């Protein structure tokens, strides 16, 4: 699976749950919460991840919504495990874009059966997700960077492609006007980003990362994001199910 057009209404019946979860998350941020707007930039760009097991509304959406079943079909996987949740909130007038990046290089997950759902909780057009078609097939992964400092995440830069500028380089960029609860489904290897939010309304987005049958733990040349300290997994192992529970299994 690479990029699928909008999965219309995937979280439509859970919008209020997600809004409540986002509000709780912002009132009580987790250890990985970050404000991504630097000095001199306007607005606020808050993100946080790995909170589903302490915010009941997120857990409800993951366990009860059709997302895991849809993911199994997209990945052609018999089973689905949760990897992590992520919220990204851009206040009105935020100039900071979401930097172009692939998720895969940040993760300690190897395999092709994976999917990320990105779903807005507000109507979006200009501030929607943007994906570069075919980028999951590039010969090397794109260099992971820190969003604020914009420096390299790992020391071995030669193993990665430099972060491109898809607009300037004429790449095929796909983006969608989306209603609350719609979702874009894409592979961890897809290069993606988003513009700043220059509108007068908030842009709240919920993202859910799921993995399938072939997902295995892989060592990276430095701390990953999320880091999941103390996981005690070894290369080639299925991700431990007490931390990354199975949320769907196709009936035999």
What is the meaning of each model-derived region?
Residues 124-191:
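Double-stranded beta-helix
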Residues 21-26, 32, 37-40, 142-147, ...:
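Non-heme Fe(II)/2-oxoglutarate
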